[in-house]
């Protein structure tokens, strides 16, 4: 049993996250002075999500009654997730699951089964190439991401492209269907088994029994970092 959810965090995590604990500490102190404050905060956040959902519903209702409904691709996503106290943290600015897990819904005429759900993690670099595919543009040689069209057609399709996120300089996380691997700029690491620990309570990075998994994920992240970018934005073409 751990004394706190930060007890098994490595030095890199503590350095990156320590100055972001003010929100959690402040909310904890407020809840002690005014019991129920934390519950009110969570309810307020849920209410904001509910309101946003209702407005999306209004847009979709309007689209359904328009002449372009059957020729429109709908994509719904968020730029980040949000902690509401998980890992003793509130807001985003982290490499853990809650900060990086976003809603991501794609609806395209004639593609996939309505209401189907895919459990395979992707990152948002799939968005552009997927839209190209859906629009009939097959040449994606200039895209850094991979089209998720195979997953739209079959949510259980083979997918060998782990989701990668970055926060701050040289702090990265890699997510597969089972594992979340985090590597900080100082080389320290976290490893979570989402099959048995979906809340990321226990950091397995220092356990001898998990070193094989850790090494594979470490190599996979390095492979992604070493890959040459498809488009060279450092050498823009002159405008004519």
Show where each model-derived region lies:
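Active-site-proximal cap/lid insertion segments
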Residues: 1-121, 134-142, 183, 200, ...
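Hydrophobic residues in alpha-helical segments
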Residues: 63, 151-152, 205
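C-terminal cap/loop subdomain of S1 sulfatases and analogous C-terminal strand-loop tails that border
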Residues: 80-86, 112, 123-128, 132-194, ...
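Surface-exposed alpha-helical segments enriched in charged/polar residues
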Residues: 61, 219-222
């Amino acid at each position: 049993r751990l004394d706190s959810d930060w007890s098994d965090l490595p030095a890199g995590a503590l350095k990156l996250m320590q100055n972001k604990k003010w929100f959690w500490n402040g909310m904890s102190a407020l809840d002690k002075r005014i019991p129920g404050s934390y519950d009110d905060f969570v309810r307020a956040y849920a209410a904001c999500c509910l309101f946003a959902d209702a407005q999306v519903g209004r847009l979709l209702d309007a689209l359904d009654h328009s002449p372009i409904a059957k020729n429109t691709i709908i994509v719904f996503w968020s730029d980040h997730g949000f902690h509401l106290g998980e890992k003793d943290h509130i807001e985003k600015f982290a490499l853990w699951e809650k900060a990086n897990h976003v809603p991501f819904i794609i609806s395209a005429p004639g593609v996939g089964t309505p209401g189907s759900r895919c459990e395979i993690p992707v990152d948002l670099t799939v968005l552009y190439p997927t839209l190209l595919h859906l629009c009939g543009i097959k040449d994606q040689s200039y895209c850094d991401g991979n089209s998720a069209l195979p997953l739209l057609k079959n949510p259980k399709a083979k997918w060998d492209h782990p989701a990668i996120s970055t926060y701050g300089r040289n702090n990265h996380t890699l997510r597969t269907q089972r594992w979340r691997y985090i590597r900080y700029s100082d080389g320290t690491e976290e490893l979570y088994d989402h099959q048995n620990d979906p809340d990321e309570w226990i950091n397995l990075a220092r356990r001898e029994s998990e070193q094989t998994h850790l090494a594979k994920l470490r190599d996979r992240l390095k492979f992604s970092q070493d890959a040459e970018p498809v488009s060279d934005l450092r050498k823009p073409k002159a405008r004519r």
